[in-house]
């Protein structure tokens, strides 16, 4: 078994770039514990649609935080970071290399740069705001935020309803701009000098094709049944899992609201758009990561 020259390994990248397969090979070679850094793979409901490792793959190396959380839970970055700290201690005591793998840039940013201490938003405030803004266009949310919190509005895209709602929730709950909390960060969990961080960067056209093909393969392998089971749970549509890529459109088809081919087209479109955002986030928010073609990444990690 090879010996690592670092105390933690981070494998990030866009969806469908081959992160999980690479991380598993490296865990086998380096004696690693795989720690999930994907905000959808933490949930147990959608193994297929979230591309979570299979049960057979999970037997090949220790896996942590994969399918660990019920879909009814709003599992925040702070909760994930707390769990990650505990697993890091487990890895150290076992003499195993912690290997973080996933596509959620915010998780990696929290690990390597620290996390802002943002107060929890009470459920009643969140529910009232969600009810008031249901069906409201993202551009209208941005206009409201611009009027009430221009500093934060300037940082957010008018096409990003999730982050716009988050900014409005914090404003409602605290009377303060989310920007004021983001300016104060706790210390990073990992020492950047002792961490190897890699961002997989496949060629864009090939990645888009792989995304489309994988989405079709997921549907053929049982994703429809997964989504139907999730739909029957009657969870709040605002929960993170209910907004997973493809889920709203597949549910819309299952409820007879849109044709099947339209649901599939929109699911693929949203996943490709997510991949573009992952590239953008990494470029601007993850400065310590080395970008590598997938075929070069294993050698880079082992060097």
From Swiss-Prot:
Annotated positions binding ATP: 13-20
Function, as annotated: Catalyzes the transfer of a dimethylallyl group onto the adenine at position 37 in tRNAs that read codons beginning with uridine, leading to the formation of N6-(dimethylallyl)adenosine (i(6)A).
EC code(s) of this entry: 2.5.1.75
Protein keywords: ATP-binding, Magnesium, Nucleotide-binding, Transferase, tRNA processing
GO MF term set: ATP binding; tRNA dimethylallyltransferase activity
Record has Magnesium as a keyword: yes
UniProt-listed GO biological process terms: tRNA modification
Cofactors that this protein relies on: Mg(2+)
Binding site for substrate: 15-20
Recorded family membership: Belongs to the IPP transferase family.
NCBIfam families: miaA
Name this protein carries in UniProt: tRNA dimethylallyltransferase
Complex formation: Monomer.
Lineage: Bacteria, Pseudomonadati, Pseudomonadota, Alphaproteobacteria, Hyphomicrobiales
One Pfam short name: IPPT
UniProt-annotated site: Interaction with substrate tRNA, residues: 104, 126
Name of the top EC class for this enzyme: transferase
Stretches for region Interaction with substrate tRNA: 38-41, 162-166
UniProt catalytic activity: adenosine(37) in tRNA + dimethylallyl diphosphate = N(6)-dimethylallyladenosine(37) in tRNA + diphosphate
């Amino acid at each position: 078994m090879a010996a690592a020259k670092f105390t933690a390994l981070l494998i990030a990248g866009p969806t469908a770039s081959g992160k999980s397969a690479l991380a598993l090979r490296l865990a086998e070679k380096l004696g690693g514990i795989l720690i999930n850094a994907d905000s959808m793979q933490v949930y147990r409901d959608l193994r297929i649609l979230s591309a979570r490792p299979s049960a057979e793959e999970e037997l090949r190396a220790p896996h942590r935080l994969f399918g660990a959380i019920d879909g009814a839970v709003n599992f925040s970055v702070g909760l994930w970071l707390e769990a990650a700290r505990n697993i890091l201690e487990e890895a150290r005591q076992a003499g195993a290399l912690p290997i973080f793998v996933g596509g959620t840039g915010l998780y990696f940013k929290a690990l390597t740069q620290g996390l802002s201490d943002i107060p929890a938003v009470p459920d009643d405030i969140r529910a009232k705001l969600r009810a008031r803004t249901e069906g409201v266009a993202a551009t209208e949310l941005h206009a409201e935020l611009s009027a009430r919190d221009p500093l934060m509005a300037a940082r957010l895209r008018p096409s990003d309803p999730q982050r716009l709602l988050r900014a409005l929730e914090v404003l409602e709950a605290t009377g303060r701009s989310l920007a004021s909390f983001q300016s104060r960060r706790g210390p990073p969990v990992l020492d950047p000098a002792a961490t190897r961080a890699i961002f997989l960067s496949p060629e864009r056209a090939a990645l888009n094709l792989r995304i489309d093909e994988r989405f079709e393969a997921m549907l053929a392998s049982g994703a429809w049944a997964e989504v139907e089971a999730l739909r029957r749970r009657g969870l709040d549509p605002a929960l993170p899992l209910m907004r997973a890529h493809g889920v709203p459109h597949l549910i819309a088809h299952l409820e007879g609201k849109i044709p099947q081919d339209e649901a599939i087209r929109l699911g693929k479109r949203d996943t490709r758009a997510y991949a573009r955002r992952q590239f953008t986030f990494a470029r601007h928010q993850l400065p310590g990561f080395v970008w590598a073609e997938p075929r070069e990444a294993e050698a880079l990690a082992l060097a």
